[in-house]
Amino acid sequence: FERKNYFYPDLPKGYQISQYAHPLVSNASFALSSGKHIRIRRIHLEEDTAALTHQQDSSLVDHNRAGAPLMELVTEPDFSSAAEVKEFASEFQTLLRYVGASRARLEQSELRFEANVSLNMGTKVELKNIGSLYALEQATLYEIERQKALLDKGEKVRHETRGWNEVLRETVLQRSKEEAHDYRYFPEPDLPPFAPPIIFDLEALAARLPELPWQKRARFIKEFQLDSEAARLITESPALADFFEQAASELAAWAK
C-alpha cells in the first residue's frame, strides 16, 4: 500500500491510503453486448474520502464514509460513446450483485462512477463521484460537447476535475487535475506489504461462480422466448430473476 498525498476538504488527514505500484488485478477485460471488449487496466484497494455536497455558495462535508475501504476499477480509454459508458457501468453493477461482492446501491453510495473524457488525447477531464447511471450518461454527453466546442474555437482543454450539477445540467469545475508525481506516492509505513500466500487457480474460481447475468439472460431468451430487452430488465436484479424463474416453473407445473 502507498500514501497518496494531496490537500482537499474531503481528505482530513492530507493523504489517502491506496495501491499504486502493485494493484490486486491488472490486464483484464469486460465484454459489452456488441462484442466489444473494454480493457481493464487495474483493480486496487484504497480508503474512501468524505462526501462533499456542493450548494450555491458553500459546500457541506460528510465524514461518515471517510476511511472506509473501497475497491476501484480503472479501464483503458476504449469507450467511443456515452452509451457504451452507461452499458459498462450498468453491467458491472449487475455483476457485483450476482457474485455477492456488493449490493451496489447507487442511492447509498455503494457504487460511484468517475468518467474521464478526452477528445484531444492526452488531456483528460475527470468527472468525479457521479451517483446514477442516467447522470453518468448525461455528464459524459455534456462534457463531450463542451470539449468539442472548445476545440472548435481553437481553445485548449484544461486538465481538470469537474462535477455534474443536476440542477444546471452541466459539468462544473472543482479543481485543477494533478499529475501522478504531484501525489508523492510512498510506501504506507503503518501497513505491512500485502502478499497473497497462494496462487489462485482461475479455472477453479470460475467453476465456483454462480450463473452470471449475461448467461442467465441468454438462457431466459432461449428457454422462455423472451425478447432481449425483457430478459435484460428481468435479470438486472438477482432476486427478480429468481422470482421470475420460480413463478414460470410453478406456472408450468400448474398448466400440466
Positions of predicted regions on the chain:
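Basic, nucleic-acid-interacting segments
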Residues: F1-P210, K222, S228, S249-W254
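Extended, structured, electrostatic nucleic-acid-contact surfaces
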Residues: W214-I221
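Histone-fold and other basic nucleic-acid-binding segments
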Residues: A218, S228-K256
